[in-house]
């Protein structure tokens, strides 16, 4: 871990905040703050991810739908920080409906990221778009669950 005593007070505070974690019920920890890569081109995702990790971030979020997993994985590998210090989250597309589609998506993400493992895999916005989004009768349910 980096020696934060040589940093300015502001820089030290920022670094300490980036190191804060939540402890999950199974005793694993997840950094409270992470870098999101949504709407980032592969080049931007690479540069932002590498810079963020080198400046204290320890959680990076990507998704198959973002089409930047390869760049994010390369940035993690090129950051100079040990892989086990970085928490990587990715997501399988919400439209995948079968077990095998999910397995194939996870395998594809593992290959693109090329990090050996993924720390957290989520279902990307897990709501049935066609059923929920186009039916006015579901409006209240959708609004109540928009953050779920």
Give residue ranges: language-model regions:
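Short acidic, gly/pro-rich beta-turn/loop elements at beta-sheet edges
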Residues: 45, 98-100, 133
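Short phosphate-binding loop-to-helix
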Residues: 95-105
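N-terminal binding-site loop/beta-alpha segment at the start of enzyme catalytic domains
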Residues: 1-86, 104, 116
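A short, structured active-site edge motif that brings together acidic residues
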Residues: 84-96, 117-126
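Feature marks short, surface-exposed loop/turn motifs that line or immediately flank catalytic pockets
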Residues: 39-42, 66, 96, 124-129
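Short active-site-adjacent helix-start/loop capping segments
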Residues: 69-70, 85, 96-98, 130-131
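Glycine/proline-rich, positively charged
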Residues: 103-148
